[in-house]
Amino acid sequence: MNDKDHFSSPAHITVLLNEAVAGLALKEKGIYIDGTFGRGGHSRLILSRLADNGRLIAIDRDPRAIAEAKTIQDPRFHIEHRSFSDIPRICERLNLVGKVDGILLDLGVSSPQLDEAERGFSFMKDGPLDMRMDTTQGLSASEWLQQVSEQDLAWVLKTFGEERFAKRIAQAIVNYNKQALQHGTEPLSRTLQLAELIANAVPFKDKHKHPATRSFQAIRIFINAELDELESVLKSAVQVLAPQGRLAIISFHSLEDRMVKHFMRKQSKGEDIPKGLPLRDDQIQRTQTLKVIGKAIMPTEQEQQQNPRSRSAVLRVAEKL
């Protein structure tokens, strides 16, 4: 049995399991943060490689992930029901700022979240139109769609889903909910109901992709403020890490990956110094904070066959200077 089999469950195959943990360059006595515990695949593998005085802090905003984490009885392990954007505050409380040897983030929706119809993430299964990572906070997708304007919805679909038919889809959704309000009928409240409405609004179908794919992604990203969360943690990660500490991030769509790639490149190059200034090299204050480690890593063909949901995954790793 390999690590991927041992540290994944039938309900959730951890994507890029060995590659992500290898990217952290684990020290046996190190302090690590798994910012997206999920169902614990990465955390369990990290724990298996730490010495008795190693330490792992895991974070997740999904109550079901927290319940899963609480089954781990290990004095080296600590779970926080928070968002990963809270990493700096957690580290301040635990006196770990500048002491963390590695941070791992596995972005996106986990397989159990997609597979559990009642979570409302899937356009393939009928369930309540929820889409919240943390079901204890904020508006559900259904509630938000009942109050959003057509213009704002089109912007969300275009910006976060890169949906070419954003205006058509937004118009169809807002009109449906307006008519429901006028006639006293139920507004959009089920996943398959929304998926069908989107499919009917789209004039051209992609043979290889469900017409609701981009819209569901966009609504989910907006509802959960996913890109804001990512931007926030990127800004604070360098401060939290110890020198030579690693940042390993797995992203699943181009918006996330562009943000991660741009951040790591910018931090590894530092601020541009205008040419022609009368400064010696030793007078220039270097602003590089990270070193990019290797190239982006994608799942192997074998992993993609075993877990089709891994196809779009990209792992990027950087090290604090």
UniProtKB/Swiss-Prot annotation:
Q: Which Pfam families match?
A: Methyltransf_5
Query: Under which EC number(s) is this enzyme classified?
Result: 2.1.1.199
Intrachain S-S bonds: none
The reaction(s) this protein catalyses: cytidine(1402) in 16S rRNA + S-adenosyl-L-methionine = N(4)-methylcytidine(1402) in 16S rRNA + S-adenosyl-L-homocysteine + H(+)
Query: What is the top EC class of this enzyme, as a single word?
Result: transferase
GO CC term, one of those recorded: cytoplasm
How is this protein named in the record?
Ribosomal RNA small subunit methyltransferase H
| Annotated organism of origin | Pasteurella multocida (strain Pm70)
Recall the taxonomic lineage recorded for the source organism. Bacteria, Pseudomonadati, Pseudomonadota, Gammaproteobacteria, Pasteurellales
Q: Which gene encodes it?
A: rsmH
